């Protein structure tokens, strides 16, 4: 029987089926995730990536030293903090 390779995808989804051999020993085989599990994993992964990109761009913009943007920067920082708190509660 062909053995599946242990890829980052199969490691991260961790879908394991346990089978019994004729001699009573148990073997573990990585199973294929269904469509719902795949979509759930995809959405969790992309949400984490999007949040990281959004955080990086906000931090980069907030680090600018332009005096004209100081009031905007203050308002944006307050909005970002409230957004972060809101994201943690959801």
UniProtKB/Swiss-Prot annotation:
Residue(s) at site: Low pathogenicity: 66
Keyword terms: Apoptosis, Host cytoplasm, Host membrane, Host mitochondrion, Host mitochondrion inner membrane, Host nucleus, Host-virus interaction, Inhibition of host innate immune response by virus, Inhibition of host MAVS by virus, Inhibition of host RLR pathway by virus, Membrane, Modulation of host cell apoptosis by virus, Viral immunoevasion
Protein localization: Host mitochondrion inner membrane; Host nucleus; Host cytoplasm, Host cytosol
Cellular-component GO terms for this entry: host cell cytosol; host cell mitochondrial inner membrane; host cell nucleus; membrane
Residue runs in coiled coils: none
Domain of life where this protein originates: Viruses
Miscellaneous comment text of the record: Is not encoded in all strains, and seems to be dispensable for replication.
Oligomer and partners: Oligomer. Interacts with human SLC25A6/ANT3 and VDAC1. Interacts with host MAVS.
Alphabetized HAMAP family for the sequence: INFV_PB1F2
Chain's role: Plays an important role in promoting lung pathology in both primary viral infection and secondary bacterial infection. Promotes alteration of mitochondrial morphology, dissipation of mitochondrial membrane potential, and cell death. Alternatively, inhibits the production of interferon in the infected cell at the level of host mitochondrial antiviral signaling MAVS. Its level of expression differs greatly depending on which cell type is infected, in a manner that is independent of the levels of expression of other viral proteins. Monocytic cells are more affected than epithelial cells.
Record-stated family: Belongs to the influenza viruses PB1-F2 family.
Protein name listed in UniProt: Protein PB1-F2
Species: Influenza A virus (strain A/Chicken/Scotland/1959 H5N1)
Native organism taxonomy: Viruses, Riboviria, Orthornavirae, Negarnaviricota, Polyploviricotina
């Amino acid at each position: 029987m062909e053995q599946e390779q242990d890829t980052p995808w199969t490691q991260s989804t961790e879908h394991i089926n346990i089978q019994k051999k004729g001699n009573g020993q148990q073997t573990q085989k990585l199973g294929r995730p269904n469509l719902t599990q795949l979509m759930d994993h995809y959405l969790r992964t992309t949400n984490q990536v999007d949040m990281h990109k959004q955080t990086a761009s906000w931090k980069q913009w907030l680090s600018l030293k332009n005096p004209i943007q100081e009031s905007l920067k203050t308002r944006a920082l307050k909005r970002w903090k409230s957004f972060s708190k809101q994201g943690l509660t959801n």
